Swiss-Prot record:
This is Ribosomal protein uS12 methylthiotransferase RimO. It comes from the Bacteria. [4Fe-4S] cluster 2 binds at C146, C150, C153. Residues 132-362 form the Radical SAM core domain. The keyword 4Fe-4S applies. Residues 1-116 form the MTTase N-terminal domain. GO terms for cellular component: cytosol.
Length: 430
């Protein structure tokens, strides 16, 4: 069967679908990039925040409408289905199969059997599985689910308890990816700092990193989703000292007002977060620190928002993502009073991004005149397009490299940085 896969949402979905693609190929199916050729289409959805849910629903409706002109088997899976399967199945009857948060093996079997509906206790963590990857980088999921108690977050409601994969399983997957030519391994989970607590009775992310660092090959490792409340000195030391680890810290602090942080269910206050950032930079001044923040949380005042801006001024994050709060069914914050209007939340969002852009510009300027090791991934007639340790795929910037000689793509090269703006760097091959 010719199968097309449409992935929405976070990198964890991409990791699952890469595994699913490999399983389907092993079972004799053909994966097609042109949906017009597909006999079956799988849509992997996101159910985290309002904008992501809307994107998923719009995509489902688009494909449901396609069926008016050409018959094919339409399967919708993932987080949105896990949360709203009954409502969705009633509203969009054109979908042939609704599958919740299941392992890639279960998904493959359900599609082959044309299972119309399968939503049960989440079972996304897998040990041994084949692996497919069509990029120079690959997401590797080391755990799923979450045991944290952030008041705004619905993920534990549909992902379930935190579940780690074994070190051996992850090592085997990374080794296979390196063997097929992947140059950057990106470790993901809802909270990578919690890795191992359920299997080894303690967090062992640092041990996992040391094990993966021993794999032979010319590749690098990036770690995403480091919860600031549980990021330890050992973890920081491992990321800063191991030669295959990129000095990149993705630390979602969420806010800078102590009052709002407390209402969010976070543990560390703004001063402790600044101490964490200072500790990282004391180990590697050029380490990239990325964060995510939220505006419009219930009860957020002008003073709270100003404290967030003051915090960002002190923290000087290299990269930042900002979200506007939305009520999520079943969360503690959804029942909180003193909601912030959409207009005010949008104003704060736009003002924050403008404010942060100047910080990012000043941070990137420090690399002009320096040499950086970059991964060249694309080319045109005049330039190569690359990423440095500062740049996670899809969410950060890039390095534009003047084309002065032929190089292997993908490949690592040393580049002298010649210019910068708020998000991107320019450079020349050495």
């Amino acid at each position: 069967m010719k199968i097309g896969i449409k992935v929405l949402g976070c990198p964890k979905n991409e990791a699952d679908c890469d595994v699913l693609e490999a399983i389907l190929k092993d079972r004799g199916h053909e994966i097609v990039s042109d949906i017009e050729e597909a006999e079956a289409v799988i849509i992997d959805t996101c159910g985290f925040i309002e904008s992501a849910k809307k994107e998923s629903i719009d995509e489902i409706i688009t494909f449901a409408n396609y069926k008016k002109y050409r018959p094919f088997f339409l399967c919708v899976k993932g987080c949105l289905v896990q949360r709203y399967s009954k409502e969705l199945s009633k509203e969009i009857p054109e979908v042939d199969s609704w599958l919740g948060v299941l392992s890639p093996h279960q998904i493959a079997e359900a599609i082959e059997k044309a299972t119309p509906y399968l939503v049960e206790k989440p079972t996304v963590v897998y040990e041994e599985a084949p692996r497919s990857c069509n990029n120079s980088f690959a997401y590797v999921k080391i755990a799923d689910g979450c045991d944290r108690s952030c008041t705004f977050c619905s993920i534990p409601l549909f992902k379930g308890r935190f579940k780690s994969r074994s070190i051996e399983s992850i090592y085997s997957e990374v080794e296979r990816l390196v063997e097929i030519g992947v140059k950057e391994i990106i470790l993901v989970a809802q909270d990578t700092t919690a890795y191992g607590v359920d299997l080894y009775n303690k967090a062992v992310l640092d041990q996992l990193l040391k094990k993966l660092n021993s794999i032979e090959g010319n590749f690098r490792i990036r770690v995403m989703y480091l919860h600031p409340d549980h990021l330890t000195d050992k973890m920081i030391d491992a990321i800063c000292s191991l030669d295959k680890l990129l000095p990149y810290f993705d630390i979602p602090v969420q806010h800078g007002s102590d009052r709002i942080l407390k209402q969010m269910g976070r543990i560390k206050n703004s001063e402790q977060l600044l101490e964490l950032i200072a500790y990282i930079r004391s180990h590697n001044p050029d380490a990239a620190i990325r964060t995510s923040v939220m505006v419009g949380f219930p009860g957020e005042t002008n003073d709270d928002f100003q404290k967030l801006l003051d915090f960002l001024e002190k923290a000087k994050f290299d990269r930042l993502g900002c979200f506007i709060y939305s009520d999520e069914e079943g969360t503690v914050s959804s029942s909180m009073k003193r909601k912030v209007s959409e207009r005010i939340a949008r104003e704060r969002y736009e003002n924050l991004l403008i404010f942060q852009s100047q910080i990012a510009y000043e941070r990137l300027k420090r690399f002009v005149g320096k040499n950086l090791n970059v991964l060249i991934e694309q080319e045109n007639e005049l330039f190569y397009v690359a990423r440095s340790h500062l740049d996670a795929p899809e969410v950060d910037g890039e390095v534009t490299v003047k084309k002065t000689r032929e190089v292997d793509i993908p490949g690592y090269y040393t580049v002298r940085i010649t210019d910068s703006d708020e998000y991107d760097l320019k450079g020349e091959l050495i």
